[in-house]
Design a protein with these regions (language model features):
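A short core secondary-structure module
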Residues: 44, 48-94
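Active-site-adjacent elements of ketosynthase-type condensing enzymes
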Residues: 13, 26-35
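A short, Trp-centered hydrophobic/proline-enriched beta-strand micro-motif
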Residues: 14-22
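Flexible, small-/acidic-enriched active-site or ligand-binding loops
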Residues: 33-35, 87-115
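Alpha-helical interface subdomain recognition
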Residues: 10, 14, 40-45, 108-110, ...
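Internal helix-loop-helix
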Residues: 1-14, 55-62, 203
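Glycine-rich phosphate/pyrophosphate-binding beta-alpha loops
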Residues: 52-57, 100-102, 138-142
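N-terminal glycine-rich flavin-associated loop
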Residues: 1-2, 28-31, 44
């Protein structure tokens, strides 16, 4: 892990961007059933497979890749985390056309015989599942807030529109059939935001927050979509 400190310094200084490569095409963030293969070859690991729906896939300077070093039957006990520079030979990316997330974007990362020194391993071999699960609840609350930002902007633009648009000699905002649904969504967006903040506050206090994180991850994206 000799190269981790310089990378950490760059990340803290805002000089580098890191992606988290966990999700795979066959399913969501199911860390216990990863298929991307990571095989030991002397002082190197060789990576083959695909990660998909990865935030900043084509913008990141480096990515933390979670892959299977154990057998498929080993489940959660055969996952290892590696720090992989995005300019490593054999690594390619593609970008999705994502509405609402253009500043960050998402995409796929493809690994074809990508060789990474053993020194790039984060933690112990086959122990990566524990590492990623520790960060899941924190990220779920943040994802909820990210989606709610889109919902909030959509509501603000809609309120502005109905106060300007005229119908039957009045602004649309004068009609309760128009404003009542918007008021309901305003209430729900604010409620979901507080759930996200509660989850983050509980984490800061060192308290259990898995339930709140799950609520945040479900409610925030749903409201943004609705």
């Amino acid at each position: 892990m000799t190269m981790c400190k310089p990378v950490q310094d760059k990340l803290v200084a805002g000089e580098a961007l890191c992606a988290i490569a966990l999700t795979e095409p066959r399913g969501g963030s199911d860390a216990a059933n990863l298929r991307l293969r990571v095989e030991r070859d002397g002082d190197f690991y060789v990576i083959n497979g695909e990660k998909t729906s990865i935030s900043a896939a084509d913008q990141a300077d480096i990515t933390v890749v979670f892959g299977r070093t154990g057998t498929p039957e080993s489940g959660a006990h055969g996952v290892t985390a590696l720090l992989v520079p995005m300019d490593t030979p054999g690594l390619t990316t593609s970008r999705f056309d994502c509405h609402g997330q253009r500043s960050i974007g998402r995409g796929s990362i493809f690994f074809e015989n990508v060789r990474i020194p053993v020194s790039h391993r984060l933690g112990d071999e086959n122990k990566g599942f524990v590492q990623v699960m520790h960060g899941f609840d924190y990220s779920r609350s943040l994802i909820g807030l990210q989606c709610l930002a889109v919902a909030r902007v959509a509501l603000e633009e809609t309120w502005e529109y109905i106060t300007q648009r005229q119908a039957f000699g009045q602004p649309l905002s004068a009609f309760q059939g128009v404003t009542h649904p918007l008021a309901q969504y305003d209430t729900e967006v604010e409620g979901a935001r507080l759930v996200c903040l509660q989850g983050l506050w509980l984490k800061d206090q060192g308290l259990p927050h898995s339930a709140e994180a799950g609520m945040a991850k479900w409610w925030g994206p749903k409201l943004a979509y609705d």
